[in-house]
Regions:
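Short, conserved micro-motifs composed of acidic
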Residues: 22-299
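Sec-dependent signal peptide recognition
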Residues: 3-11
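C-terminal motif of bacterial Sec signal peptides marking the signal peptidase cleavage site
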Residues: 17-19
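Membrane-embedded alpha-helical segments, specifically the hydrophobic cores
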Residues: 4, 21-22
Length: 299
């Protein structure tokens, strides 16, 4: 009798363990399937950067500065389209999910570098912007107020607090990164970030929604070659840490730039020049944000 009880107990235990494994496996498959439906139908990468959506987004041409809406159902990016001879034009393209189908269409000619605000209500286009209307469409192009409407900005990003972080492109092909907070309901005069960030040529800032880190690209001493991607973390005293190079998995001797993070905080996107010095083939890559989190200082 005792042996039967022991055998029965072992059988129940094995059934329980197997059920747990099956449930865990199913959950993992469901999560993977859900993620693939979110990111333009792509399987998410690990710690090694991969071209994003080959053939759909990334081609043997020029694609740049992509970004998702908060619900991950719309992906906007810039594309260069060749015309007759050596002429070309730039377009703002969207890939959006409708009835579980991803469809690509041209939004407009390029009006600036797209950045979607954390709340999804505003699309910033460097010195311009569009607002999401009640019917879900984007408004007509509007100009930012002074002084932002006249600054030579390539990319403007904004935190959940509404703070602007943007670059200022200069005639000598150098650049600085500035910020502007909302004070008493108005944007303050733009201020330069510290000298550690504004060393060399610094462009294309991306501010975390909670302002806990700033990602940007810079060509400076100690890099891998051309422009590299760096991150600076905000310290407990409110100051910014010395910039950290994201390392050899992301940065190469080629030009890397225009980094951003998906609204869910899971993946880092960036650009890499895969062609010659003429930049005829610039691709969009993505990689797990864990590669960045590994650099975060331990408190």
């Amino acid at each position: 009798m005792k042996n039967h009880i022991i055998k029965f107990s072992i059988l129940v235990f094995l059934i329980f363990v197997n059920a747990c494994k099956t449930e865990k496996s199913n959950n993992k498959e469901n999560n993977s399937s859900t993620e693939e439906r979110l990111y333009v139908g792509q399987k998410p990468p690990g710690l090694v950067p991969e071209p994003f959506a080959p053939g759909l987004v990334t081609t043997d041409g020029w694609e740049n500065c992509g970004g998702f809406t908060p619900n991950l159902k719309e992906y906007y990016f810039l594309r260069k389209v060749e015309e007759k001879g050596e002429d070309y034009k730039m377009e703002l393209v969207v890939i959006e999910n409708s009835n579980n189908q991803w469809k690509k269409s041209v939004v407009s000619p390029r009006m600036g570098t797209p950045f979607i605000s954390p709340d999804g209500k505003t699309m910033y286009l460097s010195r311009k912007y569009r607002e999401r209307t009640n019917n879900g469409e984007w408004s007509e192009i509007k100009e930012l107020e002074a002084p932002f409407d006249s600054l030579p900005t390539m990319r403007l990003t904004v935190s959940s607090k509404g703070t602007y972080f943007f670059d200022e492109f200069k005639r000598d092909f150098t650049g600085d990164i500035r910020y502007s907070r909302i004070v008493d309901g108005k944007y303050e005069e733009p201020k330069l970030l510290n000298r550690q960030i504004n060393t060399g040529k610094s462009f294309h800032p991306f501010i975390a929604p909670d302002e806990s880190y700033l990602i940007f690209d810079s060509k400076r001493e100690g890099g891998y070659g051309d422009s590299d991607i760096y991150i600076s973390f905000r310290k407990q005293n409110g100051l910014w840490s010395d910039p950290i190079n994201l390392g050899g998995k992301i940065n190469t001797k080629a030009w890397e730039a225009s980094a951003s993070v998906t609204p869910d905080g899971k993946y880092l996107f960036f650009n890499r020049n895969m062609g010659s010095e003429n930049y005829e083939n610039v691709d969009i890559f993505w990689v797990s944000m864990q590669i960045v989190e590994n650099l975060r200082p331990k408190i």
